[in-house]
């Protein structure tokens, strides 16, 4: 069991991801603290395995309750590429590269998935969040990060990058995974 009021550490080198998680956490009265350090990522096709392994290794270093988030963009017409290699693909071929790969393809359906793993050294639990949508025809918007400028969530006409953080979090894969984590944390935290 976790003591009420304990800050949960977040290991990420992505400042935007931490800001997004901190904003989501406010809705659940959960305090997060940014842990600075190298997130060790194994090579795997499974986001959950990547997230769980990174959380276990992070706990060995920080020795405190923490979460690790690994996310990916899965494009149906590209056989779910880039998937767990999303960050690498973003840093190499980028948004324009994905759009180029989809030139002339009508089915632009895709989804974002987050595997958010919590550990406190006693337990390890992973929470999955998914948002379905499609890849836009062009880069649109200047908010958000990563592939936000080309991802349109289901039920929307705008990309994530055309939405405020609050609007994005109504749809976000990360917000959905965090909501499951918050529900778990409520039952796992000691009652006063």
Curated annotation (Swiss-Prot):
Keywords: Hydrolase, Magnesium, Metal-binding, Nucleotide metabolism, Nucleotide-binding
Residues that, per the record, bind Mg(2+): 41, 70
Lineage: Archaea, Thermoproteota, Thermoprotei, Sulfolobales, Sulfolobaceae
Annotated active site: 70 (proton acceptor)
Assembly and binders: Homodimer.
Name used for this protein in its record: dITP/XTP pyrophosphatase
Pfam hit, one: Ham1p_like
Residues that hold substrate according to the record: 12-17, 71, 145-148, 168, 173-174
Organism: Saccharolobus solfataricus (strain ATCC 35092 / DSM 1617 / JCM 11322 / P2) (Sulfolobus solfataricus)
